[in-house]
Every structure is written in structure tokens, then in C-alpha cells.
Amino acid sequence: MTITVGETYTFKLTSGEEVVGKVTAVEDHIVSLHDPVSVAPGPQGMGLIQSMFTADPKESARLNINNVTIFALTDSSVKAKYIEATTGLVVPDKKLILG
């Protein structure tokens, strides 16, 4: 699987942590991520929290792909929560209008 710039991926790190982020660049063994968040347990189940609290939010974070055990495109429901967590925009459910 090739990592595509502009897509949102979930990365499982060698530490066991899961990171979700929109890919902004891919260079050799480095993937740049916009607004990376970590998956963490909370009172209502799994949630998304900021991965790096002291980093400049205007800059992409760089992830060494050698520290990744597995990755995949992010599930659409998690991607909607990622967009909500990073932008404040709520993605509406897709519904068909019936006649």
C-alpha cells in the first residue's frame, strides 16, 4: 500500500500507540502529518487527543515510518471525528433524500 498525500491514515506505532493524521508529505522514510491525534480511552470509550501538546500547530509533525508496525486509511466514522476534533466542523451523516 502506498501512502497518498491528502489522505487521512491511522498508524500503529511500535510503542502500541495509534496516531491518526492527514498526510501532507512523504519523503523516504518520513511521513509528515497535519494535526496528528492519538487514540486514547475515555469515560465514554475511545477518543482522540492531541498527540503533541507543545509543538507548533502550524507545522506538520514528522513521523519516522520505521517506528510504524501497521497503517491503513482511517475508517470514515473515525475520520469524521478527526475532522471535528481538529477543525471544530461537524461532518453530517450521509443520508439519501427519498421522494
Q: What residue ranges belong to the model's regions?
A:
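Conserved RNA-binding domains used in RNP assembly and mRNA/RNA metabolism
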Residues: T2-G99
